[in-house]
């Protein structure tokens, strides 16, 4: 019973969170970034950042921070990016954290950006390594879309890789999208533009997924009972959350109102 109540409460809270975020669309951002492979750096070192994309939810305008763009601005030839990487990365992260400073009151939606390997802390630490002083986004402003989906639909709503399967199931365009392994290969091959295009695509995908969750139209492989369980209370909660329940209750209320 306690486990069921916990699952139901987590689902309800996650749905409320999504609705609150979408209702405050003017202060909602979606973020993703690409970086060096975790497995190709010396033990304990933070991976180099290649590009960051931040999208305004209410306008779909996207702000880009990319290593190749900084190189272009500084008139550094593409083939010389590698030997100037630290300086270019520092400038890119400086621009990003200037943006953060102006948007600290905003809510930030991300996908699994949770720790020092891959996350806000990793970007902050990388900037510190390069001699910068990052502006910190408070934890209560960060919302992990990956975790919210698990809370809403259950851990089995898709197997790994969940993001790719969500894209396929919901007929979302995957043009320019690279999976983790392909991104690692792209970094090794110095394909920075390809990496950035993938980063831009992923914030676009997050936007589509968030819209579908908010409208109740996201398709998953979750069975109707999985977020609740198969106990009598779980079945009741599942039925109660279905749109038909609201229709039936409205009709019954109308009939009873006329009778009474």
Regions found by a protein language model. Give the residues of each.
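Conserved non-catalytic scaffold segment of RNase H-like nuclease domains
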Residues: 2-121
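Charged, low-complexity, helix-prone segments enriched in Lys/Glu/Asp/Gln
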Residues: 6-23, 89, 192-199, 220-228, ...
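Metal-dependent phosphoesterase core characteristic of DEDDh/y 3'-5' exonuclease domains
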Residues: 50, 61-67, 74, 106-196, ...
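Short, solvent-exposed coil/turn linker segments
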Residues: 66, 79, 144-145, 179, ...
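Secondary-structure boundary motif
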Residues: 101-102, 129, 215, 259
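Juxtamembrane amphipathic/hinge helix adjacent to a transmembrane helix
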Residues: 201-238
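C-terminal single-pass membrane-anchor helix
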Residues: 227-260
């Amino acid at each position: 019973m306690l486990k069921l109540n916990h699952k139901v409460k987590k689902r309800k809270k996650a749905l409320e969170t999504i609705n609150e975020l979408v209702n405050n669309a003017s202060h909602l951002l979606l973020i993703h970034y690409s970086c060096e492979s975790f497995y190709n750096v010396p033990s304990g070192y933070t991976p180099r950042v290649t590009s960051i994309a931040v999208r305004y939810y209410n306008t779909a305008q996207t702000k880009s921070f990319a290593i190749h763009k900084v190189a272009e601005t500084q008139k550094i030839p593409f083939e010389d990016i590698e030997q100037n990487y630290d300086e270019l990365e520092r400038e890119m992260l400086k621009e990003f954290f200037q943006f953060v400073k102006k948007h600290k009151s905003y809510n930030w939606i991300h996908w699994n950006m949770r720790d020092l390997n891959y996350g806000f802390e990793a970007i902050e630490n990388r900037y510190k390594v390069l001699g910068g002083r990052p502006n910190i986004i408070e934890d209560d402003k960060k919302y992990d879309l990956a975790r919210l989906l698990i809370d809403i639909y259950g851990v089995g709503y898709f197997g790994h890789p969940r993001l790719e399967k969500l894209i396929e199931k919901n007929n979302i365009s995957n043009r320019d999208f690279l999976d983790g392994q392909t991104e690692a290969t792209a970094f090794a091959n110095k394909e920075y533009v390809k990496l950035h295009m993938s980063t831009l695509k992923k914030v676009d995908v997050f936007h589509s997924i968030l819209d579908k969750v908010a409208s109740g139209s996201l398709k998953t492989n979750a069975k109707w009972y999985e977020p609740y369980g198969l106990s009598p209370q779980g079945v009741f909660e599942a039925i109660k959350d279905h749109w038909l329940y609201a229709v039936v209750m409205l009709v019954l209320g109308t009939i009873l109102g006329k009778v009474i």
